[in-house]
Amino acid sequence: DTEHRVSLAGLSQPRVEPEVVFGFARAPRAGMTLPQLADCLEWVAHGFEIVHTHFEGWRFAAPDCLADFALHGRLFVGPRVPVARFADLALDTANLTVTLHRDGQPVETGHASIVLDGPLNALRLWVDGMAEHTPGWPIRAADLVTTGTITDAWPMSAGQRWHTTLGDPRLHGLTLATVG
């Protein structure tokens, strides 16, 4: 589904982040190359993560944020596209552009390469970090992972309509209509 109504109730200072989302077909392991990691994936999709924090003005240090279990509020994942439709998943997702619109007006165009040199590379770094720092928490088939925002995180309020247009026809834009 590409259109969603989302309640902002219970969220503090919510912001919207357009991201790339990957779904695993099988468990990856640390130290994989990008092509090896791509072979562990079943699908790729565009998603919206809504993040929030009670730290006033979004001013905090990363350790404070992590200790507070802050940021993630909601996740909306668009249509899942089989990775087999991408000749070079690392390059194709790194070259992705996303234009974020609020109430019909473009607010920012982002390039996925800003996400640690591309979403698949960001995923590789995350897989390696998970193996090193949380070896008892394995990544399994059917898990999904978001890879980081492609634009700034934009403040949201009730009554807005957020929409994305993507520079790759294989991936679908999403629309969020916000309510209180």
Where are these regions (language model features)?
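Short strand-turn-strand beta-turns centered on an Asx-Gly dipeptide
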Residues: 102-103, 147, 167
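Short, aromatic- and glycine-rich surface loops/edge beta-strands on solvent-exposed regions
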Residues: 162-165
